Amino acid sequence: MSQLKEIQEEITRHEQQIVIARQKLKDVEKTVEADPDDVNKSTLQSRRAAVSALEDKLADFKRQLADLVSSQKMGEKPVDPTGLEPDDHLKERSSLRYGNVLDVNAIDIDEPSGQTADWFSIGQYITGFALAIILKALYMLSTRGRQTIKENKGTRIRFKDDSSYEEINGIRRPKHLYVSMPTAQSTMKADELTPGRFRTIVCGLFPAQIMYRNIISPVMGVIGFSFFVKDWPEKIEEFLIKPCPFLKKSGPSKEEDFLVSNDAYLLGREKALRESHLAEIDDLIDLAASGDPTPPDSIKSPQAPWVFACRPDRCPPTCIYIAGMAELGAFFSILQDMRNTIMASKTVGTAEEKLKKKSSFYQSYLRRTQSMGIQLDQRIILLFMTEWGSDIVNHFHLGDDMDPELRTLAQSLIDQKVKEISNQEPLKI
């Protein structure tokens, strides 16, 4: 009953506030009619927003009251001796107990979860902002991503920065960058920004700026990304001139050497990708070419690997038709799975890392990238792994275990002290 009383009091209080707010709104409307300057117009907008917010809150409290009264009535109904709910269609009770009621009112079946994003609309939205707020938001959603997402789950957050503003009637106002933080039950619109879509589009549009500022996601940092991208132009050039095991050599000549090189294989891959083009992604690439963005034009570009520095969950659409780029992202995903498997096999590592015995970065990346209309060439991933796999695995950050002699000495000191102060068995360090 106390909860019912609290809701009724809130309804009464909000009704009183609405009466006052509506009166203030009428007064401002009269003032604007008499003197329609910018200050009065701004006040009018804020009064309207205040009334709207109060009406929304009142409607919410009335819904809560209706739900509470309904649940109390249900509780007062006599319990069926069979244990069946009154609207259950079964004649005899199931062996399963009744679980939670899942409210699906908020779900829009015309916009099902997991649909392909509208990358052109998202790209247009992002390129309308100053670079400073974009990179700061990227930092918050990559380098500090886990904490930001955890604190704001289930809400639509706004990023604000002095570099991002718009002028309306001569008044400068903040231009917020909106990003949705969905839960597992959320349904996303095609043009709605989520952390994954944001990282994907920004990494694809501004890799040179990310490289210059050295913005790297922790997930990429621990697989040795900084080591891998060092001297990238030389590294990729060495890879491209090597003979490809999937192309057969017919005779000794310089021209023949090129025709059986990894470079020739990637050229063949690029021809195959031309048949997979989607108009929406082509429009996005044209949009990027006409403005400030710096997407790579080839896998040889110095900024090419930096497309994946903030761990986008798929290959960014701006470079999906560049031979080898989607496969390079898949290579990084496999490295993340490999490191997680190593961490799960060790005695060190966080509890979360030990739980990740089945890591699925690669499967997730593959599924999301292929939803954009291309099939990955796994032979290119194999070439990358053969060329660089051994070297980069040696640069994984694995959280060094304690030296055996140091562990033995520390344990002996623990045992000695515990015996002095307690009769309990000492724990192992």
From Swiss-Prot:
Listed Gene3D superfamilies: 1.20.58.90
Q: Which residue intervals make up region (Interaction with host UBE2I/UBC9)?
A: 188-191
Q: What is the lineage of its organism?
A: Viruses, Riboviria, Orthornavirae, Negarnaviricota, Polyploviricotina
Name of the protein described by the UniProt record: Nucleoprotein
Locate the region Viral RNA-binding: 175-217
Pfam families xref list: Hanta_nucleocap (PF00846)
Broadest EC class assigned to this enzyme:
hydrolase
What this chain does, per the record? Encapsidates the genome protecting it from nucleases. The encapsidated genomic RNA is termed the nucleocapsid (NC) and serves as template for transcription and replication. The nucleocapsid has a left-handed helical structure. As a trimer, specifically binds and acts as a chaperone to unwind the panhandle structure formed by the viral RNA (vRNA) termini. Involved in the transcription and replication initiation of vRNA by mediating primer annealing. Plays a role in cap snatching by sequestering capped RNAs in P bodies for use by the viral RdRp during transcription initiation.
The sequence motif named YxxL is recorded at 178-181
Classify the source by domain of life. Answer: Viruses
Organism of this sequence:
Tula orthohantavirus
Which stretches does the entry tag as region Interaction with glycoprotein N? Answer: 80-248
Keywords for the protein's UniProt record, in alphabetical order: Chaperone, Coiled coil, Endonuclease, Host cytoplasm, Host Golgi apparatus, Hydrolase, Nuclease, Ribonucleoprotein, RNA-binding, Viral nucleoprotein, Virion
- Which family, according to UniProt? Belongs to the hantavirus nucleocapsid protein family.
Q: Where is this site: Important for the endonuclease activity?
A: D88, D103
Write out the annotated subcellular location: Virion; Host cytoplasm, Host perinuclear region; Host Golgi apparatus, Host cis-Golgi network
GO cellular component terms, semicolon-separated: host cell Golgi apparatus; host cell perinuclear region of cytoplasm; ribonucleoprotein complex; viral nucleocapsid
| EC code(s) of this entry | 3.1.-.-
User: Region Viral panhandle binding: what ranges?
Assistant: 1-175
Region (Homomultimerization): which ranges?
A: 1-79, 100-125, 373-421
- Region annotation Interaction with host DAXX: residue ranges? 373-429
About its domains, the entry says: The N-terminus is required for chaperone activity and, in trimeric form, this region likely serves in high affinity vRNA panhandle recognition. The N-terminus also contains a coiled coil region, which probably participates in but is insufficient to initiate N trimerization. The YxxL motif is indispensable for the interaction with host MAP1LC3B. The central region is involved in specific RNA-binding. Has distinct cap- and RNA-binding sites so it can bind simultaneously both the vRNA and mRNA cap.
Q: Which GO terms describe its molecular function?
A: endonuclease activity; RNA binding
Q: Where is this region: RdRP binding?
A: 1-50
